[in-house]
């Protein structure tokens, strides 16, 4: 029984894998330069199928450690025999066109006549034929099918040889340049031999019995022993963070306790956050713990819980304690040395006698701390006024400064409720202003405010629809 008869018998029993078997069992002969590389990866013989060549190339790259340890889809082959064969120093598995060009030059398609005369092929054919004869000798129907298929196979081989041996009749077989189309791609653009779709390791002692799986379910890529074939897939993928957020305030929860029995249970909103998603770049750049510009030396340590906080934060992120030596902890402004103290004699003299214009330059005057006298006054000494006028002007300026500081301090004290923790999470600072129309409410942190807007919730205070969320920086 010939090999073509055995193949046709398999076609009759299982029509589905016919196309796969025919395409994958087309043999190619490897040139000596590429054959040396394949044999170093464990290949035996000089005729292989296309998938076997691809498999041993992947094994060679893995065993030699030619792939980049950080970006494992990149192969560095500059100082290796593979690089000399390719003519390049590096290539990417995601774009293996240089590798395919090299295969087209170093693989020759083998005709049916040449494949039938291969020694290793004859051994596998003999063993396969013996097994098939033992299995199906008792079935007359199968015998008829074998005869018919044998005739068809011999006709196909004869027509194949006649069509390709017209140009060179003296040669026993024709070596054709490999002109195949690589369609072994998955949706990600990676070749199948790097995805590890081969279920078993190859044993080329019997090429005919090599079990080459189909590549129909390429999306699932279910394999049994592909640890070595998937060396480049160890790259870190985009991390996904699943969290459940229930945007309900404490007051609304108490009101809805009695209604939970009659209504359906509260819906939990599941959020999936992608770290590399472009839509969340602005949110993550404004988060509290991802300030990349602040170094560890600039952070301040809380005196209560010893947590390091950002220098722009006035409260501890963990225990909400006010930062030590913050400007509110400084003592109130006292009378400085620049504030003049008017002696009683001068004031009484001013009341009784009015302005005293001396007839000579005074040698001793009232305190003039912080008041600069113009130099032009020395040019007209006889018109110099009493120092009391300058002192009264400085006193009025210092009084205005004190009043301004007290007003600012009062405004800070009145805005202290705004510095309380977030109304929803009770943990972060209130820095997310919820804007609706021409008004806004500052009762939540920026993260909770963004979650409210994404889930189309209303304002926690007035239940108005949220138009935008603005982050507030309190300095």
From Swiss-Prot:
* PROSITE patterns noted in UniProt: SWIB_MDM2, ZF_RANBP2_1, ZF_RANBP2_2
Q: Where are the zinc fingers (RanBP2-type)?
A: 296-325
From the Swiss-Prot or TrEMBL record, what is one GO molecular function term?
Answer: zinc ion binding
InterPro entries (UniProt xref): MDM4, p53_neg-reg_MDM_2/4, SWIB_MDM2_dom_sf, SWIB_MDM2_domain, Znf_RanBP2, Znf_RanBP2_sf, Znf_RING/FYVE/PHD
User: Motif range for Nuclear localization signal?
Assistant: 427-430
Q: For this UniProt entry, which segments traverse the membrane?
A: none
Give the main localization category.
Answer: nucleus
The residues covered by the SWIB/MDM2 domain are 26-109
Keyword Zinc-finger found: yes
**Which stretches does the record call RING-type zinc fingers?**
422-463
Q: Where in the cell is it found?
A: Nucleus
Keywords, alphabetical: Metal-binding, Nucleus, Zinc, Zinc-finger
A GO cellular component annotated for this chain's UniProt record is: nucleus
Provide a GO biological process annotation: regulation of gene expression
Q: Which SUPFAM superfamilies match?
A: Ran binding protein zinc finger-like, SWIB/MDM2 domain
UniProt record similarity statement: Belongs to the MDM2/MDM4 family.
Which PANTHER family does this UniProt record tie to the protein? OS05G0521000 PROTEIN, PROTEIN MDM4
- Subunit details: Binds to p53 and p73.
Protein task: Inhibits p53- and p73-mediated cell cycle arrest and apoptosis by binding its transcriptional activation domain.
Q: What is this protein called?
A: Protein Mdm4
